Amino acid sequence: MTTTKVNHKRAVLRLRPGQFVVTPAIERVAIRALRYLKSGFPVHLRGPAGTGKTTLAMHLANCLDRPVMLLFGDDQFKSSDLIGSESGYTHKKVLDNYIHSVVKLEDEFKQNWVDSRLTLACREGFTLVYDEFNRSRPEVNNVLLSALEEKILSLPPSSNQPEYLSVNPQFRVIFTSNPEEYAGVHSTQDALMDRLVTISMPEPDEITQTEILIQKTNIDRESANFIVRLVKSFRLATGAEKTSGLRSCLMIAKVCADNNIPVTTESLDFPDIAIDILFNRSHLSMSESTNIFLELLDKFSAEELEILNNRVTGDNDFLIDNSQFVSQQLAGQPN
């Protein structure tokens, strides 16, 4: 991902395809979202924290192959943070003494208008990714209504520019938001939601999470699957379902992969890493969380032992069958 300087020194992003993990579940959501975007409709990705909304939004923006403006919702935002404001002055002074007996003096002060991200994206036809837009107050986001529906952006009166900006046909917006029960999140006005195509982002399935861990941390598949199953079981047992477990999985997997820590129940270090990362996401007491976690480790340890026994039994059966086959072949050979 690189930044490029454009009008008024505003930085835009030019995305480079990264390690975006594509599984059937993710691909279905991405295809749906791209259909709406290519038809000119803004897309709203809604879901709990950690479900990959921002990552998918950046992937969709990359697929549109246009420069990207990235904007993060903020409770302190004002309308000027979206559309721009007058910043600084230009001082022009002209002294005309062409006729020596006549002195003409012109002194002019003029305010400079600086576009903000929304205005620049509307003017140039960029893709705007508005991350966690419902952290901004609803009245601030009202400036989006006319831009999305009538394709006209209303600007404050200024001597340097017109009061209305016609939106570039290539302008696209991708919104992301967290549930309203999250701290610091505002209710979104119905008028804005009515203009968006909202896609609910579910918790990534085990296959998707496993593939993400493998590609992002270079951990082996068996260890990645073990971490995903352990984190999912712990979250279900403790009722910590408000957020996604994907971030926890990534943190555990990266630490284990970077420090060559075995991902097994017999490892001395792995349980400590899992406890440090998982327990602060649980609303239960330390003793309750510890009891649940130890029970899960015992359960997973028994499962590992059963799998190992099945493998050994299968290998022994293969050796016995192979030995019998060889004996039969030797018995059938002529002396």
From Swiss-Prot:
The principal localisation class reads: other
What this protein catalyses is: ATP + H2O = ADP + phosphate + H(+)
NCBIfam families, per the entry: gas_vesic_GvpN
Q: What does this protein do?
A: An ATPase that functions in gas vesicle formation. A minor component of the gas vesicle, also found in soluble extracts. Gas vesicles (GV) are hollow, gas filled proteinaceous nanostructures. During planktonic growth they allow positioning of the organism at a favorable depth for light or nutrient acquisition.
| Lineage start | Bacteria, Bacillati, Cyanobacteriota, Cyanophyceae, Nostocales
**One Gene Ontology cellular component annotation?**
preribosome, large subunit precursor
What name goes with this protein? Gas vesicle ATPase GvpN
User: Which positions are annotated as binding ATP?
Assistant: G47, P48, A49, G50, T51, G52, K53, T54
Q: What is its EC number?
A: 3.6.4.-
Tell me where in or outside the cell this protein is found: Gas vesicle; Cytoplasm
Species in which this protein is naturally found: Dolichospermum flosaquae (Anabaena flos-aquae)
CDD domains xrefs: AAA
According to the record's subunit comment, the protein's assembly and interactions are: Forms homodimers, probably interacts with other GV proteins including GvpA.
Q: What UniProt keywords are attached to this protein's entry?
A: ATP-binding, Cytoplasm, Gas vesicle, Hydrolase, Nucleotide-binding
**Single GO molecular-function term?**
ATP binding
PANTHER family annotated for this entry?
A: MIDASIN, MIDASIN-RELATED
Q: Which family does it belong to?
A: Belongs to the CbbQ/NirQ/NorQ/GpvN family.
Which GO BP annotation is one of this protein's? ribosomal large subunit assembly
Family matches, as InterPro entries = AAA+_ATPase, ATPase_dyneun-rel_AAA, Gas-vesicle_GvpN, P-loop_NTPase
